[in-house]
Amino acid sequence: MGDQRPQDRPSSPGMDSTPWYCDKPPSKYFAKRKHRRLRFPPVDTQNWVFVTEGMDDFRYGCQSPEDTLVCRRDEFLLPKISLRGPQADPKSRKKKLLKKAALFSKLSPAQPARKAFVEEVEAQLMTKHPLAMYPNLGEDMPPDLLLQVLKPLDPERKLEDAGSCEGQEKTTDEPTEPGKYPCGEFSPRPPETRVSCLPPEPPKTPVSSLRPEPPETGVSHLRPQPPKTQVSSLHLEPPETGVSHLRPEPPKTQVSSLHLEPPETGVSHLYLEPPGTGVSHLCPEPPKTRVSHLHREPPETGVPDLCLEPPKSRVSHLRPEPSETGVSHLHPEPPKTLVSSLHPEPPETGVSHLCPEPPETRVSPLRQLPPEAGVSHLCPEPPKTRVPPLRPETPKNGVSPLFPEPPKTRISNLRSEPPKIGVSHLCLEPPKTRGSHLRPEPPETGVSHLRPEPPKTRVSSLHLEPPETGVSHLCPEPPEKDVSHLRPEPPDTGVSHLCPEPPKTRVSHLRPEPSETGVSHLRPEPPKILVSSLHQAPPESSVSHLRPEPPETGVSHLRPEPPKTRMYSLRPEPPDTGVSHLCPEPPKTRVSSLPPEPPETGVSHLCPEPPETRVSHLRPEPPETGVSHLRPEPPKTRMYSLRPEPPNTGVSHLCPEPPKTRVSSLPPEPPETGVSHLCPEPPETRVSHLRPEPPETGVSRLHPEPPKTRVSSLHAEPPESRVSHLCPEPPETGVSHLRPEPPKPRVSSLRPEPLETRVSHLRPEPPETGVSHLHPELPKPRVSSLHLEPPKTRRVSSLRLEPPKTGRVSSLCPEPTKTGASHLKELFQEGTSSTMECVSDSLQRRHTSRKLRDFKWAGDLGVNEESISSLFDFTPECRATYQDQKNKKANECSSGLKYSMELDEMDEVKFFSQEKDLDGKIQNAPNSHSAQHVKMGYGAWYLKPKLGKKLRSDEPLIDPKLVLEKPDEPDILDGLYGPIAFKDFILSKGYEMPGIIQRLFARRGWTYDSVKTPIQRAMQVYKYKEDVTDASEED
């Protein structure tokens, strides 16, 4: 079987077979024509045409192919070019080109013309101006050094000879000729500062607006227009501070240049410096000159201050500096002049605008008057001038603008824009002058103090009309009362304002109008009320007097003004909070309702009313800040300052007490909650209404009622109701809680003592809530604590208001002993019993079998799974599991189940004789899942696939010659025991040996006698097994 004849085998390629490309027909493109030429002309060399010299020259047009010679392969062995006619010399031919020939190698006429034009322009520039390549040379170096540089660069002195530079040294106001300096190299400017000219104005014209407009610098530009003087340039000189100073320097000018000179503060100061005094004054000096508003607009610095300084006074700050405290003081001190409006205008910068415009009076300089604090005061001192109403008009700033509108006097707008501090201080301190004092406080405390001081000055109504900004307004008050105005402007903090009233004067409502800022607006309208200066109190007593009247701002205004009442201030302690203090003063003054409505600031407004009326309701409405307003004012109780705390919390404290009780500051400390604490302490007065309304703000409104009423409801309730009702606020706002308590309840945070004692600071510190409790211990008064929750906190240590959008009123129990935490616990425990019962029923039903539930009769008989299983003894040993029931493999069976079978002796011999063969044949089947893919090949690409052999791609190819010479495969009978035994049988019988046995022995080289049965190998194995058996038996 293994024999294969050579003729049967295929022949290898390369011997007798032709290449494969010869067998393949050519492409149709190369198909031959009838005359044995290929169709594709470019490839067929028989169609090539050889032309004579000059035929490829198309400069004179296309030549006729008359002289062309067509050469074909069948006609010539080599291409022959026959030149008919005389041949000219190549050099002479080039010279014979006609003019009409197109010269494509030369430049076009436009190119040389353009080049000549460029060269001419460069020549003109260099001849006219040697420094054309250095346009900034005149600006970058001083005149002296410039002259030295021009000597080598301009030897011919073409630059106006030395007169241009000498004139520059003599006067910087003389401009150079425009023709001499086309590029503006030499600008006659001082080497260090950019000068802005201030145009003067006629003598009887009001001073034009002072409007600084540098976009990136804190330099404010003052543009006064005095009649006969030239205003000097503006010089910026703030070396270390971003403070811009405006300093007019001409000797006889009304408004001189704005000079920036911040000495120690980052506050921009406006200094007007008359020649005779070292004090900077901001005042038009002509008697009949009106001063327009001063507008500063440094975008990057929010600290604009207009400061008119006396010789020994500190610089006044018109802008609240600290980012966290926005306390600005405006202190006008004219003897008989009313304060004009202070109008803030810069949207992004705290630029204050001061525009004095008295027609017949000279505006006195603004003076700083810091008595005990480092507060600068701006004191205008125009004599015999009435102050028109202050009208703020800032569109988007929380700046308090006071806008005067008197017929003869106009004061420039003063605008402060503290970004994150909403406390502004206005202090009027002239003896007989109605002035506004803007005084910034320390940066860490946003306490604003307003102290009215003029005794005999009448001030017209202050009207606020800022559409989008909360502008604080001042209200005129009686001559002997210091009516102060506190305007907080921090967007994140709720500032409360306190406004004292005259003893017997009825004050009209205060009406704020800011839409987007929590700026308080004071709009007083009494005919015979004098507006006292806004003065910052000493640092020890953080008492601020405020008279807020904004209807839309959440600023709380208190207006007590008793003629003989002492004022005490509640001073909160948090350092980083802009807190305003409210000081009640009227002993017999009735406070009218004050509805604050600041959209973004929790500023509460208290509006006092007729003198004999008790404290009426106070209604704050800030939408986003949790500022609470409390206004209880018994007839003979003193009002204490209301101070909001840290900027993040709009917490305001208002604590009225009996006439002889001094209450110290109440410092709440909720870090991020707008919790306001209100502690009324009149001897017989209960807590008045507390009404939280804004859906998104934790602003609570307190409506105090007459002194004989107990606690009234949060939403309007009867005045005799003893229990105060708490209206749940929205879930995202901190709701203030009003909880009246007896005089001896347990006080969590504040515990005011009896009369004639000063209440010390009690700091509420609930662990997880920012709600503090103020519990006064007066003999009979009801103490109510106003608690505002954090905007997103539901758990309040004392009281918790949850449902924001529900109209129901949940009353808080006024029991003295229990706190709000216990109430919450009780509320939780009320629903606990029913809830637990429901849970137990559901659990019991869940664990009941479905089948048993289907048979209700079985359940009625008390039959369940446990009763049935108890009837049978189920032990863990008999418990059926999945492990016992599943089918097992043979290797998983126990050893006891396994058994073995032994072979007999003959079978062992046979088995061992074939042992080696079995080892080679029996192999584990490869795992098809884990087998890796192997790329196979079938030989070289140029070989026929039939001639190739299947091989791995990474194995070397097999030579075809070796395939032809491969050895014969071994016969299957070679290694078998059967053929040998059959041979022995044939020999024993004498039969003819079959051919297959003959070929086997011939192939193996065996002889019939050499190989016999039994096979020698098998015999040796059998003998070995017998020896081992005998030895084992002997042992």
From Swiss-Prot:
Ranges of compositional bias, category Polar residues: 533-544
Location of region: Disordered: 1-21, 159-797
Secretion signal, residue range per the UniProt entry: none
Pfam short name (any one): FAM47
Bias type Basic and acidic residues, positions: 159-173, 478-490, 611-622, 683-694, 753-766
Compositional bias of kind Pro residues: 380-392
Annotated InterPro entries: FAM47 (IPR032743)
Assigned protein family: Belongs to the FAM47 family.
Protein name: Putative protein FAM47C
The organism of origin for this protein: Homo sapiens (Human)
